[in-house]
Amino acid sequence: MARPRTDIAPRILLAARQRFLQSGVDGSTLRAIARDAGTSIGMIYYYFPTKDELFFAVVEDVYVKVLADIGQALSPELPVSERLHRLFERFASLRDDEIEVLRLVAQEGLLRSPRFERLVTRFLNGHIPLILRTLLDGTRDGVLDGSRHPIVLLLATAGLVGPPQLIRRAVGDRLPVPGAPSGKALAHELVDVLLHGIAPRRVPAE
């Protein structure tokens, strides 16, 4: 039987996301989530059989949209360099709800919760193969160093695509050196670092 279309499920997801951020998944009660959502525990169980399923729904509600954008950004018809720029630009424009879900995922990883394994499985069937395919195309085309293990390339990309943007946004103007790029400008700088490193470029002798 199809469930009726109402705004209850989105309200539950929003309330759960905020509660999970505040108290963690294990520290949040369905009673508190129901109260925040203006509904009953029974309605939560109607849509989400367990608290863990509610957590995964909170993640998936945001992740599926990000995944679609990543898939579009990394379209194999595009040159690898352009794909990387588009990927980094997408992470430069993360919305608040997307950052909140990233925080939830990070919390689960730090706590080494059983839920994290399911998240890893989801990501291994989601954005990770899309990014890895782009990097392998880059080694084939000579854009990236094919002598390096593909997972090294993947980890380097992961380290540059998201964390610097989050740190830059959190620190704001409190950086010790003025004029630091942000947003898309920072994204392009980070792609350049990924492709060329931070050592000074050598000018060929004439």
Annotate each PLM feature:
Residues 10, 58-86, 116, 131:
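Amphipathic alpha-helical linker/stalk segments
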Residues 11, 19-53, 57:
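Helix-turn-helix
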Residues 96-118, 167-173:
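Amphipathic alpha-helical segments used for helix-helix packing
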